[in-house]
């Protein structure tokens, strides 16, 4: 069916003889229409991409924020002496967790207090403070383990970093460090970690004053307010101008006024000379 081709009529596909000229014109028009449709489609895609790139979503993946450093104690394994330690509390918003970081012997230890752990610890401290105020903390009851409850946070430890992890049961109880000072105790026994290494058996001693400070760090209302403050700080866009500043009270404005006035006086003689 294909007739003899003319060299000048070869356009990448089989062009027919002049007797089939209408068919050839129809094919050319079809190709042109296809190119126009493809161009319009590509243009629309570019516009969509450009439009979508200007409306990026803002993540709430805020960086960790230090809440404070608590000066408290750890009790040695024989329970005969206490050592002062710094306990750093850090709020990690993306995972809604408060990190309690401290040194124990050679290890750097971190307790990851999720919301359930914070609630359990706060309730235990409230019971301790209530009995301390009522003076019902006796030596007889101090030997009872987990007197104020328990929780199971994630613990990581290591000499140079968080090389190991486990989920020990942290007990809340109290111990008389001296004859008249019953301290709130956070303690755990050693258990095998995820990689087979045993976690440290720690024993943290907090006074009533230090417990009150921990309550502030773990208060959910305070954490929510901090998160809102961080969001406002990161989302600040426009420069803030103090409406109370006026040319009379703003020293910079007064200085600029004098500078402009001096420039006008310099231009005066030149205009006269002209």
Curated annotation (Swiss-Prot):
<feature type="region of interest" description="Disordered">
    <location>
        <begin position="235"/>
        <end position="274"/>
    </location>
</feature>
<feature type="compositionally biased region" description="Basic and acidic residues">
    <location>
        <begin position="241"/>
        <end position="274"/>
    </location>
</feature>
<protein>
    <recommendedName>
        <fullName>Uncharacterized protein TP_0772</fullName>
    </recommendedName>
</protein>
């Amino acid at each position: 069916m294909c007739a003899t081709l003319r060299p000048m009529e070869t356009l990448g596909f089989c062009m027919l003889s002049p007797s089939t000229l209408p068919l050839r014109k129809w094919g050319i028009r079809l190709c042109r229409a296809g190119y126009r449709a493809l161009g319009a489609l590509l243009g629309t895609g570019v516009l969509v991409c450009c439009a979508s790139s200007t409306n990026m979503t803002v993540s709430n993946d805020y960086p960790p924020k230090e809440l404070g450093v608590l000066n408290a104690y750890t009790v040695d394994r024989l329970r005969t002496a206490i050592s002062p330690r710094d306990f750093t509390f850090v709020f990690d918003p993306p995972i809604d967790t408060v990190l309690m970081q401290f040194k124990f012997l050679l290890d750097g230890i971190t307790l990851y207090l999720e919301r359930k752990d914070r609630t359990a610890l706060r309730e235990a401290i409230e019971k301790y403070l209530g009995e301390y105020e009522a003076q019902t903390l006796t030596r007889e009851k101090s030997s009872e383990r987990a007197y104020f409850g328990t929780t199971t946070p994630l613990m990581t430890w290591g000499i140079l970093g968080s090389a190991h992890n486990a989920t020990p049961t942290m007990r809340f109880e109290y111990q008389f460090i001296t004859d008249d000072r019953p301290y709130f105790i956070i303690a755990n026994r050693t258990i095998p970690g995820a990689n087979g290494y045993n976690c440290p058996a720690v024993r943290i001693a907090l006074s009533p004053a230090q417990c009150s400070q921990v309550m502030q760090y773990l208060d959910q209302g305070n954490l929510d307010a901090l998160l809102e403050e961080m969001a406002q700080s990161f989302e600040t866009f426009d420069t803030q101008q103090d409406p109370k500043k006026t040319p009379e009270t703003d020293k910079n404005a007064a200085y600029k006024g004098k500078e402009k006035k001096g420039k006008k006086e310099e231009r005066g003689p030149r205009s006269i000379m002209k």
